[in-house]
Amino acid sequence: MKYFYSILISAFVAIALTSCLGDSDESENTYTAYGYYTITGNFNSSYTLYSDLGGKVIPTMSSVANLTDNKGFGNHSRAMLYFSYKPSQVSQDEKTITGAELFDGRYFDEYLPISKQQADDALITATDSIFQIRELNDVWAYRGYLNTVVNAPYSSVNGVNVKPTVNLVYDPASISENAITFDIYFNRHTDQNAASNGPVYFYTSHLLNFIDEIVPGNGDVTITIKTSNGISKDIKVSRQNFHKGNYE
């Protein structure tokens, strides 16, 4: 799949983010859309893509093959995907698009949040590995994932781009009833003198199923995410959204 950077989605793909590509009657028009999806299924049968804003998209397997160089989505569970469709492919309840043609996209990196002790041991919190995030563009939680979009430069060494990691780190001392704070570390895996490119957007999904066990209380949980240069965002998340649940 192509590795690219793009603007953020603002509405469910099926209705609000469309553009007409045809001039015939509406039933023959082709529309384009994109969104954030959880991927289910496999390359041997079929895939269903579940939108973070509700609804689902069932792509053609030929378009999946073309987009992924005939490899399928593999072990990837999260992606931002672009596709085209016709109105006749939308279900009457406007919740499902069948036979969509994927034509571009990028995977989310997927990580487990870790404790400060684990981060210290892995040198994630080492000062020379941490670079400033220009902007914490978006934070949201949905069905087992806490998702972040950050804008930051990245490094290159000898003309080769070095892929950074985006880690969420919690200190057990910061946990209180129905509340937890994460420090977000942007690690470029190079020293401060490495060539800098960008900035660009980085998309990450962090698994949340463990939060029920470590955050006391029974109510919605306030999650605070802080960067090393003072940017902070708070979101309130239903405990139900800490778990993926059944998609079918």
Per-range role (PLM):
Residues 31-248:
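First exposed extracellular module after export/assembly in secreted or surface-exposed proteins
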Residues 1-6, 10-43:
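Bacterial Sec-dependent N-terminal signal peptides
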